[in-house]
Structures are given as structure tokens and as C-alpha cells.
Amino acid sequence: MRILCLDIGSRRIGVAISDPLKIAAQPFCVLDLQKEDLYSCLDKIFNEHQIEKIVIGYPVSKFHPDKATEKLQKIDEICSELERRYKVGIIKWDERFSTKAVERILREENVSWQKRKKVVDKLAAVYILQGYLDFINS
């Protein structure tokens, strides 16, 4: 059984998946919501992999952690639909600074802007999922 992670953005969703032992997170793909249907893509992932849980990158505001933003409401709606559709546990995991951390690492490694743009979403999902895996394994 594996754990799936979604880093939900307004246009793209970064996807990462754990190894079967739930030790390491691996980049999986980036879903372009302007070109692809989220649930069709997830149906394929669920058919090909044994997913037991979904970790959702949850963007809690560092200044107003109790404030429900429009983005949080959208993510909450997606979480409800995922739970209903796939009958798996949903974990909302703090994703603050995940994209910034990944972008900084890629810049330090001199990865070009064009290449960063292609991988940053799925690597942010890896960053989020690895944080969760480290937590459950500690």
C-alpha cells in the first residue's frame, strides 16, 4: 500500500507517491488542470497503485492560521470529493514554504527557469509527502 500526495495549485497539481514501505517519497507527475481532468487522472493512479491514504498540501496562513481563504475552501471541497470517491483517509499537511524551499534548492543547483517550471510542482509534492513520511516513521 502506498500514500499519494497532492500539492494543489490553481492551474497545476503536483503529485508524489510513497514507496510501498512508506519510507521515501517519489515524484510522480504534474496534472495541468487546464488540459486534464483531476479525477480521470486520479482514477488511473488508483487503478495502477494500491493507495491507502492521500496527503494534501494544506496552505495554512502563517499570519492568520484560522482564516479560511478561498484557496482553502477549494482544497476542502476537493478533499471531501476525494474521500467520497476513493474511500481513503485524507491527511491535510502543512505545506507552507514547500514550493519556496524547492525553488531555492533548484536555483542553488543552477537548474534553468524552464526546467524548474516543469518540475517544481511535483517536487513540492515530494517535499510535503517526505515531511509526512518522516513524521509517521519517527
From Swiss-Prot:
EC annotation from Swiss-Prot or TrEMBL: 3.1.-.-
Pfam families in the cross-refs: RuvX
HAMAP family, per the entry: Nuclease_YqgF
SMART domains: YqgFc
Any Gene Ontology CC annotation: cytosol
Species this protein is from: Caldicellulosiruptor saccharolyticus (strain ATCC 43494 / DSM 8903 / Tp8T 6331)
CDD domains: YqgF
The protein's role, per its UniProt record: Could be a nuclease involved in processing of the 5'-end of pre-16S rRNA.
Subcellular location field: Cytoplasm
Keywords: Cytoplasm, Hydrolase, Nuclease, Ribosome biogenesis
Family per similarity comment: Belongs to the YqgF nuclease family.
GO biological process, one term: rRNA 5'-end processing
Main localization of the protein described in the UniProt heading: cytoplasm
Protein name: Putative pre-16S rRNA nuclease
GO molecular function: nuclease activity
Lineage of the species this protein comes from: Bacteria, Bacillati, Bacillota, Bacillota incertae sedis, Caldicellulosiruptorales
